[in-house]
């Protein structure tokens, strides 16, 4: 008889660029549905109860970052370099357009924390109207705009206390294409309307909108 077959799933080792780079009009990854292993530096962390979500990036510039969503808190922190495994998927909010989704790694695990305290990649400086480009999904970016929508805060979960507000390069907040939704990731900032704000953070995108978690 031959060697016993393994029940361990096979993971293809790829770069974040391999996962993210796409020419598809809807921005979908060419690796959707595949189980992959990749490495990057943690640039942002969300913790939702027993769930963990974080963004990792390898290098600077376009196509170098990706959002990871786990069903367990792995305890990673910003500055850790991690090797992760997961399934490539496209996420769109239930009320959004399925053709305007965000590429994620889901149902995954940490293979190793390779090092800690690493310098984060250099943020890409963008005008507000350029933030929504597919190539910057998951990438650390910096942008400056005027606060055109007051902060809405959510403190239902004691371990997920945050506010969201919106900046624009246009005084008309109804022009959504020229605005960025800012999630302050636990900092609970409530800037006054009309304030000029510079925000830096990993960029999330879904339903065609942008959400940047700034560092202050």
Language-model segments: which ranges?
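OB-fold nucleic-acid-binding modules
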Residues: 11-216
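Extracellular fibronectin type III
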Residues: 2-10
């Amino acid at each position: 008889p031959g060697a016993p077959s393994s029940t361990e799933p096979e993971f293809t080792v790829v770069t974040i660029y391999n996962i993210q780079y796409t020419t598809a009009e809807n921005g979908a990854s060419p690796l959707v549905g595949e189980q992959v292993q990749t490495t990057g530096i943690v640039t942002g962390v969300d913790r939702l109860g027993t769930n963990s979500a974080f963004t990792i990036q390898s290098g600077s510039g376009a196509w170098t970052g990706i959002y990871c969503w786990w069903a367990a808190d792995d305890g990673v922190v910003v500055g850790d370099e991690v090797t992760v495994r997961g399934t490539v998927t496209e996420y769109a909010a239930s009320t959004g357009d399925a053709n305007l989704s965000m590429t994620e790694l889901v149902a995954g695990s940490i293979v190793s924390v390779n090092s800690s305290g690493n310098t984060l990649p250099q943020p890409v400086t963008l005008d507000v109207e350029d933030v929504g480009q597919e190539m910057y999904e998951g990438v650390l970016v910096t942008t400056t705009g005027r606060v055109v929508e007051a902060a809405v805060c959510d403190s239902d979960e004691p371990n997920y206390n945050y506010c969201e507000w919106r900046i624009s390069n246009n005084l008309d907040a109804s022009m959504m294409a020229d605005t960025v939704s800012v999630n302050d990731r636990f900092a609970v900032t409530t800037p006054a309307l009309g304030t000029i704000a510079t925000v830096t953070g990993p960029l999330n995108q879904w339903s065609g909108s942008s959400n940047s978690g700034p560092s202050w």
